[in-house]
Amino acid sequence: MIERWQKDEVLSSLKCFRVVNLTGARQCGKTTLAGMLPLASTKRFTLDDEETRKAAKSDPYGFVDRADGETVVIDEIQKAPELLNAIKMRVDKNNAKGQYLLTGSANLHFVKAVTDSLAGRIGRVRLRTLALGEIRRGHGDFIERAFARDFPRDIPPLDKRGAIGLAARSGYPEAMEMDANARRKWFRTYLDDLLVKDMQDVTEIRKLDAMRAVAQWLLAYSSRFFEVSELATKSGIGKETVETYISALKALYLFDEVRPWTKGDYSKIGRRSKYFAADAGLVSNILGWTEDSIYMNDDRGGKIMENWVYQNLASLADRDPIYEISQYRDSNKREIDFIVERSDGVLLGVEVKAGSALGAEDFKHLKWFAKNLAKGEFTGIVLYSGEHTLRFGEGFYAVPLAALGT
């Protein structure tokens, strides 16, 4: 069983909050993680079960009853949002920590029937698909070490083909163990089930084909800049509808929006966001890309590797709220794939290069940013599929992709 990095965060949150919401995409491992927690006394329910769901909806206050010292674990809380008000009533009468652990595959802020946010009573923990560091049982401190310019040595090798293979196989625990054909079928069923069943918890879908088209377009545009109006024109769907569907897909944790870094006073800084799929395997399998086709096609390889690096950086950043991920682009076509900002304002720039050959040209945007926009300390790294960490001037390093897993 793979140990999840967020296990300690969930346990810590249960000691601090009356209610904890463990949230993330379907099949990323929330229920498994909840079952691994060393809780003294628990009562568990899953709202995916129809009879359980009916019972919860018919008598929410009775359903959430608990004994002293007991943690009630409720899976897929978005299926019976009526329970949230009942839980609020219970915890307002009892300040004990760790009373309820609610897992969910939808962001409760976007669930249609939610009328109370449980603000001040609830702690939220995001779980993502398996990161490289979890698979390789790493320490999960890559970002911290990158800020310190203390890069790991003796890293298990990971060449371009190996990295693409990991990305295409995905970090979904069930899918990653399948062969390629079974995995593609799994992802098609996965996406269909989300759109047909789970989407109804978030928004009203009048045209399923339109929602499916928007999801396909977002996968195709994953890790690329685009305008919503452009997507609306190409898909033949109204702009407002596209915006509604994108919000719903984000609410189900199928996509993340990475906003632009805009804290400089340079007038040409771009203001467009990028969208990344929750997992690079979702992109490759739904779009029908084989590992060989990704390896042989630079555009596909770049897209998949950037998405894969994002999901790994995001898993690392989730471990500590002092980190925030953004991206940079300006009207002069200078681009930095990711800017990681620490709460004290110190910046880490991250570029992604699928290949193993690189040179000074690969650092030009990082060095320009450091000279013209970074107000204080700045470290720039290029993640590549080579074996060694190489220095390209003060504060600039080529770092093996495999370091993400240390």
Regions found by a protein language model. Give the residues of each.
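Conserved catalytic/switch belt of AAA+ P-loop NTPases
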Residues: 84-102, 106-108, 115-117
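Domain-level recognition of nuclease-like catalytic cores that cleave nucleotide substrates
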Residues: 385-406
